């Protein structure tokens, strides 16, 4: 079974994200549980939590179908001790919010060395940040997203993801989300079925499908291997539709949230319908 949806707005409250997902006939969705561009957020009230859980029950969304995303400000590999601590506190808060909402996954970008420390040091800091957050929370899996490798962002090589996982003590609570645009921009080709076979074989060899907890299904405005993060609508960009059809037909991608972050929300319902048709249900 494929869970297919989009990253929907939580404007007006996190329960509104559930309603918006239902309106586009999504069987999965992503959301921010707080403003993604601010450090501080009001704690989740009992009323807000209850409304969210009631909406999920009403529209039949289980936690396995929901892939919340953390704040863009957080850098779990920050070279500066004070800034790193600020990010770690914020990440624990994000994990705690997921726990309160009954959510089992939290998707995040691994971090950036800001050209101030070595890659290996940054990756070790990210792993330690995850260990700290897992020790402070229960029931939520930290889901590392591959990046396009813009600037000094790490996570654009599968080896980076494997190194982080290697440093995480509780392997049962760490996973990976593959963003197709990021992978393509990071140098993993997806334009043909043979490309998909090779890229996902490489992923399985280096990281392992056992760690796959989600997908971001995005075409790319950016060129192959450009390390530029620019999403596009499915079939409109440089990846093309073949990869998305391939993913829909491959059972290795069953049972995880598959999230559109494509550039035109007006056609999300159409994109979801097409993906469902490719998955043949």
From Swiss-Prot:
GO MF terms, alphabetically ordered: deoxyribonuclease IV (phage-T4-induced) activity; DNA binding; DNA-(apurinic or apyrimidinic site) endonuclease activity; phosphoric diester hydrolase activity; zinc ion binding
Details of cofactor binding: Binds 3 Zn(2+) ions.
GO biological process terms held by the UniProt record: base-excision repair
Record-linked InterPro entries: AP_endonuc_2, AP_endonuc_F2_Zn_BS, Xyl_isomerase-like_sf, Xyl_isomerase-like_TIM-brl
Taxonomic superkingdom: Bacteria
Reactions mediated catalytically: Endonucleolytic cleavage to 5'-phosphooligonucleotide end-products
Binding site for Zn(2+) 2: 145, 179, 216, 261
CDD domains in the record: AP2Ec
Residues reported in the UniProt entry to bind Zn(2+) 3: 182, 229, 231
Enzyme Commission identifier(s): 3.1.21.2
Keyword terms of this UniProt record: DNA damage, DNA repair, Endonuclease, Hydrolase, Metal-binding, Nuclease, Zinc
Main EC class the enzyme belongs to: hydrolase
Coiled coil: none
Cofactor(s) it depends on: Zn(2+)
Any one Pfam family match given in the protein's UniProt record, by short name: AP_endonuc_2
Binding of Zn(2+) 1, residues: 69, 109, 145
Listed NCBIfam families: nfo (TIGR00587), PRK01060.1-4 (NF002199)
Family: Belongs to the AP endonuclease 2 family.
Described function: Endonuclease IV plays a role in DNA repair. It cleaves phosphodiester bonds at apurinic or apyrimidinic (AP) sites, generating a 3'-hydroxyl group and a 5'-terminal sugar phosphate.
Protein name, entry field: Probable endonuclease 4
Taxonomic placement: Bacteria, Pseudomonadati, Pseudomonadota, Gammaproteobacteria, Enterobacterales
Gene: nfo
């Amino acid at each position: 079974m494929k869970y297919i949806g989009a990253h929907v707005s939580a404007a007006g409250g996190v329960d509104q994200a559930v309603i918006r997902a239902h309106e586009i006939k999504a069987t999965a969705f992503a959301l921010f549980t707080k403003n993604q561009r601010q450090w501080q957020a009001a704690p989740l009230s009992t009323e807000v939590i209850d409304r969210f859980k009631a909406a999920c029950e009403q529209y039949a969304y289980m936690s396995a179908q929901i892939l919340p995303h953390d704040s863009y400000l957080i850098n779990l590999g920050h070279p500066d001790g004070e800034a790193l601590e600020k990010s770690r506190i914020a990440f624990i808060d994000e994990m705690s919010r997921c726990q309160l909402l009954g959510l089992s996954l939290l998707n995040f970008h691994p971090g950036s060395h800001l050209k101030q420390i070595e890659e290996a040091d940054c990756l070790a800091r990210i792993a330690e940040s995850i260990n700290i957050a897992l020790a402070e929370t229960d029931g939520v899996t930290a889901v590392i997203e591959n990046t396009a490798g813009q600037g000094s962002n790490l996570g654009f090589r599968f080896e980076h993801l494997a190194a982080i996982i290697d440093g995480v003590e509780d392997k049962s609570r760490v996973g990976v989300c593959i963003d197709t645009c990021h992978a393509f921009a990071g140098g993993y080709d997806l334009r043909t079925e043979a490309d998909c076979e090779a890229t996902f074989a490489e992923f399985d060899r280096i990281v392992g499908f056992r760690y796959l907890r989600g997908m971001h299904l995005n075409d790319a405005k950016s060129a192959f291997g450009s390390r530029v993060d620019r999403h596009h609508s499915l079939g409109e960009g440089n990846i093309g539709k073949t990869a998305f059809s391939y993913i829909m037909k491959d059972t290795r991608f069953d049972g995880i949230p598959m999230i559109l972050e494509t550039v035109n929300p007006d056609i999300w319902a159409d994109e979801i319908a097409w993906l469902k048709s490719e998955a043949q249900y």
